[in-house]
Amino acid sequence: MFVKSETLELKEEEDVLVLLGSASPALAALTPLSSSADEEEEEEPGASGGARRQRGAEAGQGARGGVAAGAEGCRPARLLGLVHDCKRRPSRARAVSRGAKTAETVQRIKKTRRLKANNRERNRMHNLNAALDALREVLPTFPEDAKLTKIETLRFAHNYIWALTETLRLADHCGGGGGGLPGALFSEAVLLSPGGASAALSSSGDSPSPASTWSCTNSPAPSSSVSSNSTSPYSCTLSPASPAGSDMDYWQPPPPDKHRYAPHLPIARDCI
Protein backbone atom coordinates (compact mmCIF):
# COMPACT_ATOMS: atom_id res chain seq x y z
CA MET A 1 0.00 0.00 0.00
CA PHE A 2 2.81 2.39 0.77
CA VAL A 3 4.39 1.88 -2.62
CA LYS A 4 1.11 2.40 -4.40
CA SER A 5 0.40 5.71 -2.67
CA GLU A 6 3.77 7.14 -3.62
CA THR A 7 3.25 6.03 -7.19
CA LEU A 8 -0.10 7.76 -7.30
CA GLU A 9 1.40 10.96 -5.92
CA LEU A 10 4.12 10.92 -8.55
CA LYS A 11 1.57 10.38 -11.29
CA GLU A 12 -0.52 13.28 -10.06
CA GLU A 13 2.54 15.53 -10.01
CA GLU A 14 3.42 14.45 -13.52
CA ASP A 15 -0.12 15.24 -14.71
CA VAL A 16 0.11 18.70 -13.16
CA LEU A 17 3.48 19.31 -14.78
CA VAL A 18 2.15 18.17 -18.14
CA LEU A 19 -0.76 20.58 -17.87
CA LEU A 20 1.50 23.46 -16.83
CA GLY A 21 4.21 22.89 -19.44
CA SER A 22 2.11 21.79 -22.42
CA ALA A 23 3.19 24.88 -24.43
CA SER A 24 6.81 24.96 -23.25
CA PRO A 25 9.75 23.32 -25.01
CA ALA A 26 10.73 21.63 -21.72
CA LEU A 27 7.83 19.17 -22.00
CA ALA A 28 9.85 16.85 -24.18
CA ALA A 29 12.56 16.78 -21.54
CA LEU A 30 10.09 16.16 -18.72
CA THR A 31 8.27 13.24 -20.31
CA PRO A 32 11.31 10.96 -20.52
CA LEU A 33 12.13 11.84 -16.93
CA SER A 34 8.69 10.79 -15.75
CA SER A 35 8.78 7.56 -17.71
CA SER A 36 12.22 6.74 -16.39
CA ALA A 37 10.99 7.45 -12.86
CA ASP A 38 8.14 4.96 -13.34
CA GLU A 39 10.52 2.34 -14.64
CA GLU A 40 12.83 2.87 -11.71
CA GLU A 41 9.92 2.52 -9.30
CA GLU A 42 8.83 -0.69 -10.96
CA GLU A 43 12.35 -2.06 -10.95
CA GLU A 44 13.04 -1.05 -7.34
CA PRO A 45 9.87 -1.57 -5.38
CA GLY A 46 11.79 -1.71 -2.18
CA ALA A 47 13.47 1.71 -2.46
CA SER A 48 12.89 4.19 0.29
CA GLY A 49 10.06 6.69 -0.02
CA GLY A 50 12.31 9.63 0.88
CA ALA A 51 14.52 9.08 -2.16
CA ARG A 52 11.51 8.82 -4.41
CA ARG A 53 10.05 11.99 -3.03
CA GLN A 54 13.32 13.79 -3.51
CA ARG A 55 13.47 12.67 -7.12
CA GLY A 56 9.88 13.73 -7.69
CA ALA A 57 10.57 17.14 -6.15
CA GLU A 58 13.64 17.60 -8.33
CA ALA A 59 11.66 16.65 -11.42
CA GLY A 60 8.89 19.08 -10.46
CA GLN A 61 11.37 21.88 -9.90
CA GLY A 62 13.00 21.17 -13.27
CA ALA A 63 9.62 21.24 -15.01
CA ARG A 64 8.67 24.45 -13.31
CA GLY A 65 12.01 25.98 -14.21
CA GLY A 66 11.53 24.92 -17.84
CA VAL A 67 8.05 26.41 -17.94
CA ALA A 68 9.31 29.63 -16.38
CA ALA A 69 12.21 29.74 -18.83
CA GLY A 70 9.84 29.20 -21.74
CA ALA A 71 7.54 31.96 -20.51
CA GLU A 72 10.47 34.29 -19.99
CA GLY A 73 11.71 33.45 -23.50
CA CYS A 74 8.32 34.28 -24.98
CA ARG A 75 7.97 37.57 -23.14
CA PRO A 76 10.92 39.35 -24.83
CA ALA A 77 9.61 38.31 -28.23
CA ARG A 78 6.17 39.68 -27.40
CA LEU A 79 7.68 42.87 -26.03
CA LEU A 80 9.80 43.28 -29.14
CA GLY A 81 6.72 42.81 -31.33
CA LEU A 82 4.79 45.40 -29.34
CA VAL A 83 7.68 47.85 -29.53
CA HIS A 84 7.93 47.27 -33.27
CA ASP A 85 4.21 47.93 -33.69
CA CYS A 86 4.49 51.04 -31.57
CA LYS A 87 7.35 52.26 -33.74
CA ARG A 88 5.36 51.65 -36.91
CA ARG A 89 2.32 53.56 -35.73
CA PRO A 90 4.13 56.85 -34.94
CA SER A 91 6.01 56.69 -38.24
CA ARG A 92 2.74 56.39 -40.15
CA ALA A 93 1.20 59.18 -38.11
CA ARG A 94 4.22 61.35 -38.78
CA ALA A 95 4.01 60.65 -42.51
CA VAL A 96 0.32 61.62 -42.55
CA SER A 97 0.99 64.78 -40.54
CA ARG A 98 3.89 65.70 -42.82
CA GLY A 99 1.70 65.25 -45.90
CA ALA A 100 -1.01 67.45 -44.38
CA LYS A 101 1.54 70.10 -43.43
CA THR A 102 3.02 70.02 -46.93
CA ALA A 103 -0.39 70.50 -48.55
CA GLU A 104 -1.21 73.37 -46.19
CA THR A 105 2.14 75.00 -46.92
CA VAL A 106 1.61 74.75 -50.68
CA GLN A 107 -1.86 76.29 -50.40
CA ARG A 108 -0.51 79.08 -48.20
CA ILE A 109 2.30 79.84 -50.66
CA LYS A 110 -0.12 79.91 -53.60
CA LYS A 111 -2.43 82.28 -51.77
CA THR A 112 0.45 84.58 -50.84
CA ARG A 113 1.70 84.70 -54.42
CA ARG A 114 -1.79 85.41 -55.74
CA LEU A 115 -2.24 88.28 -53.30
CA LYS A 116 1.14 89.74 -54.22
CA ALA A 117 0.34 89.53 -57.95
CA ASN A 118 -3.00 91.26 -57.37
CA ASN A 119 -1.30 94.03 -55.42
CA ARG A 120 1.28 94.55 -58.17
CA GLU A 121 -1.42 94.72 -60.84
CA ARG A 122 -3.47 97.13 -58.75
CA ASN A 123 -0.47 99.41 -58.21
CA ARG A 124 0.38 99.29 -61.91
CA MET A 125 -3.12 100.35 -62.90
CA HIS A 126 -3.09 103.14 -60.32
CA ASN A 127 0.21 104.45 -61.67
CA LEU A 128 -1.04 104.26 -65.26
CA ASN A 129 -4.23 106.15 -64.44
CA ALA A 130 -2.27 108.79 -62.54
CA ALA A 131 0.09 109.28 -65.51
CA LEU A 132 -2.82 109.59 -67.96
CA ASP A 133 -4.55 112.11 -65.70
CA ALA A 134 -1.37 114.19 -65.57
CA LEU A 135 -1.14 114.02 -69.38
CA ARG A 136 -4.76 115.13 -69.79
CA GLU A 137 -4.06 118.18 -67.64
CA VAL A 138 -1.45 119.55 -70.08
CA LEU A 139 -3.36 118.73 -73.28
CA PRO A 140 -5.63 121.50 -74.63
CA THR A 141 -9.08 120.04 -75.10
CA PHE A 142 -12.20 121.77 -76.34
CA PRO A 143 -14.38 121.78 -74.37
CA GLU A 144 -12.18 121.78 -71.31
CA ASP A 145 -14.31 119.27 -69.42
CA ALA A 146 -14.12 116.70 -72.23
CA LYS A 147 -13.43 113.20 -70.99
CA LEU A 148 -10.86 111.36 -73.08
CA THR A 149 -10.28 107.65 -73.02
CA LYS A 150 -6.82 106.20 -72.69
CA ILE A 151 -6.32 105.60 -76.41
CA GLU A 152 -7.76 109.04 -77.28
CA THR A 153 -5.43 110.68 -74.78
CA LEU A 154 -2.39 108.96 -76.29
CA ARG A 155 -3.38 109.81 -79.87
CA PHE A 156 -4.09 113.42 -79.05
CA ALA A 157 -0.78 113.71 -77.17
CA HIS A 158 0.99 112.30 -80.25
CA ASN A 159 -0.67 114.85 -82.56
CA TYR A 160 -0.05 117.71 -80.17
CA ILE A 161 3.64 116.89 -79.83
CA TRP A 162 3.91 116.61 -83.61
CA ALA A 163 2.29 120.05 -84.06
CA LEU A 164 4.67 121.65 -81.55
CA THR A 165 7.65 120.03 -83.27
CA GLU A 166 6.57 121.32 -86.68
CA THR A 167 6.06 124.78 -85.22
CA LEU A 168 9.61 124.91 -83.89
CA ARG A 169 11.07 123.57 -87.12
CA LEU A 170 9.23 126.00 -89.38
CA ALA A 171 9.92 128.92 -87.07
CA ASP A 172 13.64 128.21 -87.32
CA HIS A 173 13.38 127.82 -91.10
CA CYS A 174 11.36 130.98 -91.84
CA GLY A 175 13.09 133.22 -89.35
CA GLY A 176 10.97 136.11 -88.10
CA GLY A 177 8.30 135.89 -90.78
CA GLY A 178 6.33 133.05 -89.28
CA GLY A 179 4.15 135.00 -86.90
CA GLY A 180 1.03 133.10 -87.86
CA LEU A 181 2.53 129.59 -87.71
CA PRO A 182 1.96 128.78 -84.05
CA GLY A 183 -1.69 129.72 -84.33
CA ALA A 184 -2.15 127.60 -87.45
CA LEU A 185 -0.46 124.57 -85.93
CA PHE A 186 -2.33 124.97 -82.69
CA SER A 187 -5.63 125.14 -84.52
CA GLU A 188 -4.67 122.03 -86.45
CA ALA A 189 -3.78 120.22 -83.23
CA VAL A 190 -7.19 121.17 -81.92
CA LEU A 191 -8.72 119.66 -85.04
CA LEU A 192 -6.83 116.46 -84.34
CA SER A 193 -8.12 116.27 -80.77
CA PRO A 194 -11.25 114.22 -80.06
CA GLY A 195 -14.25 116.54 -79.94
CA GLY A 196 -12.26 119.51 -81.18
CA ALA A 197 -12.77 118.85 -84.87
CA SER A 198 -16.53 119.30 -84.69
CA ALA A 199 -16.18 122.55 -82.75
CA ALA A 200 -13.63 123.92 -85.18
CA LEU A 201 -15.64 122.89 -88.23
CA SER A 202 -18.78 124.49 -86.83
CA SER A 203 -16.94 127.79 -86.34
CA SER A 204 -15.33 127.82 -89.79
CA GLY A 205 -16.37 126.07 -92.97
CA ASP A 206 -12.82 125.13 -94.00
CA SER A 207 -11.71 121.53 -93.48
CA PRO A 208 -8.11 120.46 -92.88
CA SER A 209 -6.10 119.66 -95.96
CA PRO A 210 -5.28 115.98 -96.61
CA ALA A 211 -1.52 116.61 -96.58
CA SER A 212 0.82 119.04 -94.92
CA THR A 213 2.06 121.74 -97.34
CA TRP A 214 3.83 125.02 -96.89
CA SER A 215 5.20 127.67 -99.21
CA CYS A 216 7.62 130.55 -98.94
CA THR A 217 7.18 133.64 -101.11
CA ASN A 218 8.85 137.02 -101.31
CA SER A 219 5.59 138.81 -101.94
CA PRO A 220 4.20 140.82 -99.06
CA ALA A 221 0.68 139.54 -99.75
CA PRO A 222 -0.60 137.84 -96.64
CA SER A 223 -2.09 134.39 -96.79
CA SER A 224 -5.00 132.91 -94.94
CA SER A 225 -2.84 131.72 -92.06
CA VAL A 226 -0.46 134.74 -91.77
CA SER A 227 -1.46 137.75 -89.72
CA SER A 228 -2.33 140.97 -91.60
CA ASN A 229 0.15 143.13 -89.67
CA SER A 230 3.21 141.14 -90.79
CA THR A 231 5.90 143.47 -92.21
CA SER A 232 8.38 140.85 -93.41
CA PRO A 233 8.89 140.59 -97.20
CA TYR A 234 8.74 136.84 -96.82
CA SER A 235 5.68 134.94 -95.73
CA CYS A 236 5.29 131.30 -94.78
CA THR A 237 2.02 129.52 -94.84
CA LEU A 238 1.37 126.10 -93.36
CA SER A 239 -1.71 123.99 -93.48
CA PRO A 240 -0.78 120.80 -91.64
CA ALA A 241 -3.08 117.87 -91.55
CA SER A 242 -3.22 114.74 -89.49
CA PRO A 243 0.08 112.86 -89.32
CA ALA A 244 -1.55 109.98 -91.10
CA GLY A 245 -4.90 108.90 -92.41
CA SER A 246 -5.04 105.44 -90.86
CA ASP A 247 -3.98 103.88 -87.60
CA MET A 248 -1.16 101.91 -89.24
CA ASP A 249 0.37 105.00 -90.82
CA TYR A 250 -0.41 106.95 -87.69
CA TRP A 251 1.76 104.82 -85.43
CA GLN A 252 4.65 104.15 -87.82
CA PRO A 253 8.00 105.31 -86.40
CA PRO A 254 10.00 107.94 -88.31
CA PRO A 255 12.89 106.84 -90.51
CA PRO A 256 16.34 106.88 -88.90
CA ASP A 257 17.72 109.59 -91.23
CA LYS A 258 15.19 112.17 -90.04
CA HIS A 259 14.84 113.97 -86.75
CA ARG A 260 14.23 111.58 -83.89
CA TYR A 261 11.12 113.33 -82.55
CA ALA A 262 9.57 114.65 -85.77
CA PRO A 263 7.55 112.10 -87.80
CA HIS A 264 8.27 111.83 -91.49
CA LEU A 265 5.53 113.44 -93.56
CA PRO A 266 5.24 114.19 -97.30
CA ILE A 267 5.84 117.94 -97.65
CA ALA A 268 5.36 119.81 -100.92
CA ARG A 269 7.36 123.01 -101.24
CA ASP A 270 6.46 125.78 -103.66
CA CYS A 271 9.00 128.56 -103.57
CA ILE A 272 8.41 131.53 -105.91
From Swiss-Prot:
GO cellular component: chromatin; nucleus
Domain bHLH: 112-164
InterPro entries, per the entry: bHLH_dom, bHLH_transcription_factors, HLH_DNA-bd_sf, Ngn-2_bHLH
A single GO BP: positive regulation of DNA-binding transcription factor activity
SMART domains (UniProt xref): HLH (SM00353)
Subcellular location, record wording: Nucleus
Keyword Transcription applies: yes
Location of region: Disordered: 30-69, 197-264
Paired cysteines (S-S): none
Source organism, top-level taxon: Eukaryota
Known function: Transcriptional regulator. Involved in neuronal differentiation. Activates transcription by binding to the E box (5'-CANNTG-3').
Annotated protein name in UniProt: Neurogenin-2
